[in-house]
Amino acid sequence: MSLVPMVVEQTSRGERSYDIFSRLLKERIIMLSGEVNDDSSNLIVSQLLFLESEDPDKDISIYINSPGGSITAGMAIYDTMQYIKPDVSTICVGMAASMGAFLLSSGANGKRYALPNAEIMIHQPLGGFQGQATDIQIHANRILKIKESLNKILSENTNQPLEVIEADVERDNFMTADEAKTYGLVDKVITKNETGKDK
């Protein structure tokens, strides 16, 4: 069981309490922590759409501490980040691996950050299926198509040639924050909050 802290604020009408995530959302901050799955994806997509409706011209920040997870759930977040009008800045705290790293690299140009001790890992899609040989072949072909699509987007996000991405994701590829910056997964390694509310 995880505990969610409550934040109490004084207003002209008395005290008001929020859970910490609702209070952060009020500041246009979204947390992606833990596995990327349908539940976390639905929450993040909903928050992105809500914040766009609140103010389409103000940046949104997503803090990422995730080992990755479902590709389809992650692509729902990615597509929504590209679809909405506000710039979405991404900040890695702890670890961004697999789909977490993909989403980190997909933040707005110049607004992708990592804290100094963050770790980033990229690799190719994982999948497993059992059944008839033809069904296995169908699923294997699907994974290869997904791999090709993810590699193309990662190449665009990092400005790395596609052949470099294809070689580098063959196995788990771990990077420090500085290495991720050099590679093009993030734009800056930050020690103080530089994301800014109006940048």
Swiss-Prot record:
Main location class: cytoplasm
Biological processes per GO annotation: protein quality control for misfolded or incompletely synthesized proteins
Reactions performed catalytically: Hydrolysis of proteins to small peptides in the presence of ATP and magnesium. alpha-casein is the usual test substrate. In the absence of ATP, only oligopeptides shorter than five residues are hydrolyzed (such as succinyl-Leu-Tyr-|-NHMec, and Leu-Tyr-Leu-|-Tyr-Trp, in which cleavage of the -Tyr-|-Leu- and -Tyr-|-Trp bonds also occurs)
Enzyme class: hydrolase
Record key words, sorted: Cytoplasm, Hydrolase, Protease, Serine protease
Domain of life assignment: Bacteria
The enzyme's E.C. designation: 3.4.21.92
InterPro entries, A to Z: ClpP, ClpP/crotonase-like_dom_sf, ClpP/TepA, ClpP_His_AS, ClpP_Ser_AS
Active-site residues from the entry: S98, H123
GO molecular function, one term: ATP-dependent peptidase activity
One Gene Ontology cellular component annotation held by this UniProt entry: cytoplasm
Protein location: Cytoplasm
Family of this protein: Belongs to the peptidase S14 family.
Role description: Cleaves peptides in various proteins in a process that requires ATP hydrolysis. Has a chymotrypsin-like activity. Plays a major role in the degradation of misfolded proteins.
Subunit structure: Fourteen ClpP subunits assemble into 2 heptameric rings which stack back to back to give a disk-like structure with a central cavity, resembling the structure of eukaryotic proteasomes.
Official protein name in the record: ATP-dependent Clp protease proteolytic subunit
Organism: Clostridium botulinum (strain Eklund 17B / Type B)
Lineage: Bacteria, Bacillati, Bacillota, Clostridia, Eubacteriales
Gene: clpP
